[in-house]
A protein has these predicted regions:
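Metal-dependent phosphodiesterase/nuclease catalytic metal-binding core
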Residues: 58-160, 167-179
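Histidine-centered divalent metal-coordination motifs
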Residues: 1-5, 79, 161
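Active-site catalytic pocket residues across diverse enzymes, especially alpha/beta-hydrolases
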Residues: 13-16, 41-44, 90
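Di-metal (Zn2+ and/or Mg2+/Mn2+) metal-binding site signature of metallo-dependent hydrolases
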Residues: 1-18
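Short active-site oxyanion
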Residues: 22-26, 96-98
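A glycine-rich helix N-cap at a beta->alpha junction
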Residues: 44-57
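Short internal beta-strands
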Residues: 24-32, 158-159
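Binuclear metal-dependent phosphoesterase catalytic core
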Residues: 186-192
Length: 192
């Protein structure tokens, strides 16, 4: 497992405990994460006032929640390690959908599952000038993320997961806008 895929989870679990959470926490995660979190909690002599339910996912597309209010599907991504994206679809009167495609190479097959999504978050680790690095590391460029948004007929595209080599993130937005105009840079606290 890559650390940037889960390092925030132990802090979130601890925060929920400090705030007095009592309701079970369901964690849908890649295989191996339960072992890591359990080891971290044991070594830190940590505990929670609520139950952690781990649902370790295979590397495939599947429905994980389907009730009257929401449908949540996993999306099989293409990264150096097994990695899943997610599609969240509300079933209420005003249907809202959100696609989350984290670490993945350019994967046009995603477009069918993401068809007409309201908001698409897609990683764009590299600019197109470094597309050879994107291919090598199984990540995407801003151009490739924009192509996925365009082909899937997304309403909005949010770009994120930028390589630290880039200082000016507006270059990502400018690259993507040439293909998909309704593009934003992911910023903490921003509402889209």
């Amino acid at each position: 497992l890559h650390g940037d895929h889960y390092f925030g989870l132990p802090g979130l679990i601890s925060y929920f405990n400090l705030k007095g959470r009592t309701k079970d926490l369901n964690i849908y995660c890649p295989k191996g994460l339960k072992k890591i979190i359990t080891m971290m909690m044991k070594s830190g002599k940590s505990w929670t006032s609520y139950k952690l339910n781990f649902y370790e996912l295979g590397h495939k597309s599947s429905h994980i929640i389907d009730n009257e209010e929401i449908l949540v599907k996993t999306l099989k991504l293409n990264h150096r390690i097994p990695c899943n994206g997610f599609l969240f679809c509300s079933k209420e009167n005003q249907k809202i959908s959100y696609g989350y495609c984290s670490d993945t190479s350019y994967l046009p097959e995603l477009c069918e599952s993401l068809k007409d999504v309201n908001i698409l978050y897609h990683e764009s680790t590299f600019l197109s000038q470094h597309d050879y690095l994107a291919k090598k590391t199984k990540h995407s460029t801003a151009t490739e993320a924009a192509k996925i948004a365009q082909t899937s007929n997304a309403n909005k595209l949010i770009l994120g997961h930028f390589s630290a080599r880039y200082k000016d993130l507006n270059k990502f937005k400018n690259e993507a806008i040439s293909i998909f105009s309704n593009t934003f840079i992911a910023k903490e606290g921003q509402v889209y």
